[in-house]
Amino acid sequence: MRSLLKFKTAAIVAAAVGFAGFSTASMAEDTLRIVSWGGAYQKGQSVGIFQPAAKAMGITVKEDTYGGISDVKLMVKSGADKFDIFSSGAGGCASGGAEGILEKLDYSVIDVSNHLPGMYSDYCAGADIFSVVAAWNTETYGDNGPRSWADFFDVEKFPGSRAMRAKVDAQLEAALLADGVPMEEIYTVLDSEEGIDRALDKIRSIKPHIDVWWTSGAMHAQLMKDGEVDMTTGWNGRFDVAKLDGAKVAYDWKTGIMDWEGYGIPKGAKN
């Protein structure tokens, strides 16, 4: 029975990233619990993926939000049972897999034949690509906002309040790019304690100008909607939606640090 339930969980992950062909006849009346990041991103997942997949399979998908891989770790370590599938960036799943808190994914069920190289792993099936960018308030800078990470870190050329993520994801890369490290050498530099310290020191150099350390996409989008900061790091899609909602926000793709989002399964998930 448990293996059947695991198959159903893998099946809806497959629905999110591409079907490889499987029967859904036995899925009626089952419920799967999925958590993601909330806001416009999760709304898009729900409308475009979760609920259509649930309807096609004849199952119920219950959705909630969560705070990232630390929530998965807490759930698994405590023996709690809160969700079956979670949406995560590649780095979060890599960390969770290394800690032994995730199930290995079954790629005989999940079709990744059309994925870009490296966009799936033992613990995370990629679903979409995004970029971390430097966005600015157009009421402050007009069309002349930060066009590079060097600009974002230049508080004399671009005075004003800033926000950055309260986690290292893409922030270390941005800091090193601002510090003059060539793009092709970023991860060579970050593969040493000295390189990490260099990136952290660069972030510390503008810490007095960072008013907010954001913790979610909804939060950094709201910062720009409210005009609370003059510039922030964040995910391009969130800024696109915020602009549609009236936010005075712009960004330059030249600051883009590409990453991918996918789906993982917690170790011992009920379904």
Annotate the PLM regions.
Residues M1-I12:
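Bacterial N-terminal signal peptides that target proteins for export
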Residues V17-M27:
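C-terminal segment of classical bacterial N-terminal signal peptides
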Residues E29-G96, A221:
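Early extracytoplasmic/lumenal segment of secretory-pathway proteins
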Residues G39-G44, K82-F83, S87-L223:
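Extracytoplasmic ligand-binding site segments that recognize negatively charged/polar headgroups
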Residues Q45, I49, I59, R147-S148, ...:
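Short amphipathic alpha-helical coupling segments at ligand-binding clamshell hinges
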Residues V72, L223-K225, I265:
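Hydrophobic residues within well-ordered alpha-helices
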Residues G91-S95, M231-K248:
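A ligand-binding cleft/hinge motif common to bilobed small-molecule-binding domains
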Residues V112-H115, F130, D197-I206, K243-A269:
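Periplasmic-binding protein-like
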